[in-house]
Design a protein with these regions (language model features):
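Short, Lys/Arg-enriched, disordered terminal segments
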Residues: 1-5, 79-86, 202-209
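Residue-level preference for short coil/turn positions at secondary-structure junctions
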Residues: 1-2, 34, 87, 109, ...
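Short, glycine-rich nucleotide/cofactor-binding loops
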Residues: 5-21, 183-190
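Active-site and donor-binding regions of nucleotide-sugar-utilizing enzymes
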Residues: 8-18, 25-30, 36, 42-57, ...
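Conserved alpha-helical elements of sugar-nucleotide-dependent glycosyltransferases
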Residues: 19-26, 192-196
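Short gly/ser/thr-rich secondary-structure transition/capping motifs
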Residues: 110-117, 160-167, 235-238
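A nucleotide-sugar donor-handling region in carbohydrate enzymes
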Residues: 125-191, 213-222
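Donor-nucleotide binding loops and adjacent catalytic segments primarily
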Residues: 169-247
Length: 247
């Protein structure tokens, strides 16, 4: 008997960054532990992290760049899903272009539609919606955007964290600042990491450790390497699996 499947529709790249994919990989690991066969549908965007999906052992279905229209994106995704529709238990969508119009068209073949969102700026046709961000009145942000039957997982208690964070020891109160952790996401498109390092450099303050985490495909990576040599105790990290140890 063939295993039941869970599909993820998510992208990564130089423009989108890596956060959408990384949080989906965390959720995918949980489905894998429950013996589901996990599939990812991804656009082949510039700077993508599809290789990371392969490393995790999940199945990948690449679709050509559909940046022209969401309609093309939907049609290509639907064609892939149709091949597995008798086995699909859940479709997880982490993509700001998708909305109620396209999600609803998959109702006939998908038992459970699971949306991961941050924006609360469009309606969804889904069974579960996850938004772990802490906003003012976060409990009410989606009241008019989903049906009353939808299970809402809202707020920081639902944040998707890698297992390494659950084994971290509770730390004592810090009396003096000795260690700085800098990360603005894998891509850091607006180059905030370098701005912070320049500020530290101008301040002439000294710290025991200054740890900067970025993705290797970050377009400012060489600049970061260069400035890190000018400031004492700065280390640049990328694509690491133990980020909690640096925090």
């Amino acid at each position: 008997m063939k295993r039941k499947c869970v599909f993820f529709r998510v992208d990564s790249g130089n423009v989108l960054g890596f956060g959408h994919l990384n949080r989906c990989l965390i959720l995918a690991d949980e489905f894998k532990m429950e013996n589901f066969e996990v599939h990812f549908i991804c656009q082949n965007l510039e700077g993508n992290l599809i290789k990371n999906i392969r490393k995790c052992g999940f199945k990948i279905h690449q679709i050509r760049n559909s940046n022209d229209t969401i309609t093309n994106d939907f049609q290509k995704t639907k064609q892939i899903l149709e091949k597995f529709q008798d086995r699909i238990s859940c479709l997880v969508i982490d993509n700001y272009r998708w909305n109620k119009k396209y999600e609803g068209k998959l109702r006939s073949m998908i038992k459970c539609i699971f949306i991961i969102d941050d924006l609360a700026n469009r309606k969804h046709d889904c069974d579960i919606l996850l938004d772990p961000n802490l906003y003012t009145n976060f409990e009410k942000r989606y009241e008019k955007l989903v049906s009353k039957k939808c299970m809402l997982l809202l707020g920081p208690k639902y944040i998707l964290l890698r297992k390494e964070f659950f084994s971290c020891k509770k730390r004592k109160k810090i009396e003096k600042l000795k260690k700085i952790f800098i990360s603005f996401g894998g891509q850091d498109c607006s180059n905030q990491s370098i701005k912070v390092l320049n500020g530290i450099h101008r301040s002439k303050l000294e710290f025991g450790e200054i740890n900067v985490v970025v993705g290797k495909s970050n377009k400012f990576f060489k600049q970061l390497r260069k400035i890190s040599k000018q400031i004492k105790n700065v280390k640049i990290f990328s694509d690491i699996n133990n980020i909690s140890c640096l925090m």
